[in-house]
C-alpha cells in the first residue's frame, strides 16, 4: 500500500510511501492520494491534513520509468489526468498526473517536506496551502532536462507565490531551489531542523484545528478566490465568504472574549 492515513484528533497525516523510488508518483499512488484527500474533505470530524513522504523524500516527481512506457501514446497519457471541467461534467473527481493537484478542497493541507520536492513533486507541494521544509530539502523543475512540462499547476501556482519573474527563472532553468531560498522568496513558510518536518507540520495542523473551522475555511477560501479578481470583487467575495462564518461562530467567539478568554493575544485558553 503506497498511501496510508494516520489520524490524531482532527488532523489527518496522509503518507505517500514509495521510498525505493524517492516517492516518485505512479498512476496507482496518484489515484490513492486523490481518494485519501477526498475522504479527508468529506469527513466532518477532519479539520487539517498533512502530506508527508516517507523515507526522507517528499516526492521526486512523476515516475519517469512509468512515464517511459507511455511515450507516444496519447490515450494512456490522457487517462492519467482529466481537466476540471471534463471530469466534473462526467461526474468524476478531477485528477492530475500527481494525484490531487486538480482537487479544490475546502480544508487546509500542509506539506511536510524532506529531501527533494522536484518536478511534479514541486507542483504537489505548491498545491498545498502551507509548506514546511527541512533545511536540506529543496525544490526544482528537474523535469526541464527531459522534455516533461509542468502540467500539475506549477506554472499557475508558483508565479502566484513568488511573482512572475522569479517563477520564470526557476521554471526555465530547472535549477535547485534550497529551503532557505524558498522561504526567502515566498515558496515556503517554515524551515525546520532535519528530520522534523512532519512533527512541525502536525503541530501547526493541531493549532489550526483548534480554531472555529467555519471561519478558518471562509478565510482560506477568500485568499484563494481573490487571485486575479479586481479589488472591489475580491472585497465583495471576502464579505460573502466571511458573513456566514461570523453568524455561525463569530458572535459566540466575541462573547468568550468578553468573558475574559484570549486576552493579550493568548491562544492557550480559547
Outline where the language-model segments fall.
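C-terminal alpha-helix plus adjacent terminal tail
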Residues: 1-9, 70, 174-179, 199, ...
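An acidic, glycine-rich surface segment that forms the CoA-thioester-binding/catalytic face
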Residues: 30-34, 38, 64-114, 268
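Short, active-site-adjacent cap segments at secondary-structure transitions
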Residues: 56-60, 118, 223
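Terminal peptide-recognition signature
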Residues: 14, 18, 32-33, 51, ...
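Crotonase-fold acyl-CoA enzyme core
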Residues: 100-214
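Hydrophobic alpha-helical membrane-association signature
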Residues: 29-32, 197, 238
